[in-house]
């Protein structure tokens, strides 16, 4: 005997039960009491996230899919950038943000082994780790107290002819002095990577223009780990307004593949078998050309649904 007339009816009933489950067993209906400890960070969700997760689970599309595509579109529109790409963690976002700047496609501006990157002396390891991993040299600048953000008066002293980039995080929702840092980067033609994992939604104003943190530099990164402002459980995002960096972000995220056509759509660009790549024979399938060392750092659609 069939329980439902069609799949849509089944999904609606299942999600209705999930909603009722949340309201009965998960919703916090108790008032805070005097002297109760309030967590500075924790997961925050309601029946909407649980229903979206249920929807993705019923799709059973286990890798990046429609929910990820929708999130990337909505997130980029909200934060105010042209391109945003989900990854499996904020640490992966930080890794990719640095990896793309080592690409030979960037010419003289690429970061090579031995080049220097100015960063903050007080921060999280994954802001620093990719610098060391790719053979560059971190140049540490101290923080100011009580802001615990980079002391911009010490930037000039940290600069040398080997400096290629500045990579720093906004601390606990408090933006660093973006105006001073950006002027410094513009003066010396340096890349600026904003680690925005702790500060999603913070705003900063320069000359009357107000923007979200993470959008003033060349690349911004966010983390969606449970203690952050928005959660997927695990997840992160890399975003930029630079079309070349956007292509490289996709390449490094998707195994180092040169082709950035939409996954699951055959010959989306219309030039899959028309190119000549290195020493490969002419007409070699572009979908299987790998121009960079990369990783599989995509997010699952179930995580994206929670976001």
Task: Locate the predicted segments by residue.
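Hydrophobic/aromatic ligand-binding patch that stacks against planar heteroaromatic rings
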Residues: 130-131, 184, 302
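N-terminal "arm"/small-domain region of PLP-dependent enzymes with the aminotransferase-like
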Residues: 1-62, 291
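Active-site phosphate-binding strand-loop segment of PLP-dependent enzymes
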Residues: 146-247
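Active-site region of PLP-dependent enzymes
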Residues: 198-206, 216-307
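Conserved coil-to-alpha-helix start sites within the AMP-binding
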Residues: 122-128
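A short beta-strand submotif of the Rossmann-like class I SAM-dependent methyltransferase core
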Residues: 86, 119, 165-168
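Short beta-strand->loop structural element characteristic of the AMP-binding/adenylate-forming
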Residues: 137-147
């Amino acid at each position: 005997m069939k329980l439902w007339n069609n799949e849509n009816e089944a999904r609606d009933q299942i999600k209705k039960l999930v909603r009722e489950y949340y309201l009965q067993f998960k919703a916090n209906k108790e008032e805070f009491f005097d002297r109760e400890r309030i967590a500075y960070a924790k997961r925050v969700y309601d029946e909407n996230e649980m229903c979206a997760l249920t929807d993705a689970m019923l799709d059973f599309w286990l890798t990046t899919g429609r929910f990820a595509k929708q999130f990337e579109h909505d997130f980029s529109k909200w934060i105010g950038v042209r391109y945003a790409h989900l990854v499996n963690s904020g640490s992966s976002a930080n890794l990719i943000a640095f990896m793309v700047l080592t690409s030979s496609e960037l010419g003289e501006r690429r970061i090579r082994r031995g080049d220097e990157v100015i960063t903050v002396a007080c921060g999280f390891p994954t802001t620093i780790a990719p610098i060391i991993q790719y053979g560059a040299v971190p140049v540490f600048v101290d923080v100011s107290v009580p802001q615990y953000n980079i002391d911009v008066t010490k930037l000039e002293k940290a600069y040398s002819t080997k400096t290629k980039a500045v990579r720093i995080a906004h601390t606990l929702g408090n933006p660093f002095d973006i105006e001073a840092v950006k002027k410094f980067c513009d003066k010396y033609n340096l890349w600026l990577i904003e680690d925005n994992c702790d500060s999603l939604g913070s705003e900063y104003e320069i000359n009357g223009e107000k923007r979200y943190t993470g959008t003033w530099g060349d690349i911004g990164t966010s983390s969606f780990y449970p203690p952050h402002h928005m959660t997927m459980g695990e997840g992160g995002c890399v975003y930029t307004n630079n079309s070349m960096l956007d292509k490289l972000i996709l390449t490094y995220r998707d195994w180092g593949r040169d082709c950035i056509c939409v996954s699951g759509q055959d010959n989306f660009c219309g030039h899959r078998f028309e190119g000549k790549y290195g020493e490969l024979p002419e007409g070699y399938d572009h979908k299987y050309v790998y121009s960079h060392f990369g990783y599989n750092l995509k997010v699952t659609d179930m995580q994206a649904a929670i976001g």
